[in-house]
A protein has these predicted regions:
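Exposed beta-strand and adjacent loop surfaces of beta-rich binding modules
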Residues: 26, 41-43, 78-80
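Short proline/glycine- and polar residue-rich coil/turn motifs
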Residues: 63-65, 99-105
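Short, acidic Ser/Thr/Gly-rich low-complexity loop/linker segments typical of extracellular
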Residues: 51-69
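Exposed aromatic-hydrophobic patches
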Residues: 68-73, 109
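Short, ordered, surface-exposed loop/turn motifs in non-cytosolic proteins
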Residues: 35-52
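Beta-strand-rich domain onsets/edges
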Residues: 16-28, 32-35, 91-94, 104-122
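Sec-dependent bacterial lipoprotein signal peptides
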Residues: 1-17
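A short, solvent-exposed beta-strand micro-motif common in secreted/extracellular proteins
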Residues: 73-91
Length: 122
């Protein structure tokens, strides 16, 4: 009888004790045109709009041949994504949001469209 009680107790302790202490929050942004073709050399900025945390949670990189950039953050967060191409003013722009999940690479697709200075923003 004791063996029957010990086995479920041991299984419970083993299964409940398995937690990842320091999860990572990787994310990937893919930039394409309206036809779905990946675009390289696009500046991608990922930031949070929380006062006091902008510097800590700010990433910037340029897309490669495959139109991808990858980042990793330490905490769960929602990032604002801004993708731009060209000088000042931009020639193309795209934006969106991405919610990070622990230990899962979350992907966001940003569609780059021609920038219209008379209608700024995304």
């Amino acid at each position: 009888m004791k063996k029957l009680l010990i086995l479920p107790l041991l299984a419970f302790l083993l299964l409940s004790g398995c937690q990842i202490e320091n999860p990572t929050f990787p994310f990937r942004v893919k930039v394409t045109n309206a036809a779905g073709v990946p675009i390289q050399n696009v500046i991608v900025e990922a930031s949070v709009d929380v006062p006091g945390y902008r510097e800590e949670a700010y990433f910037i990189d340029t897309t490669g041949f495959d139109g991808l950039v990858e980042f990793e953050y330490e905490y769960e967060a929602v990032f604002k994504i801004l993708a731009t191409r060209g000088g000042n003013p931009f020639t193309h722009i795209g934006c969106g949001f991405i919610k990070l999940e622990p230990n899962t690479t979350v992907q966001s697709k940003i569609i780059l469209l021609p920038y219209d200075p008379s209608d700024p923003g995304c």
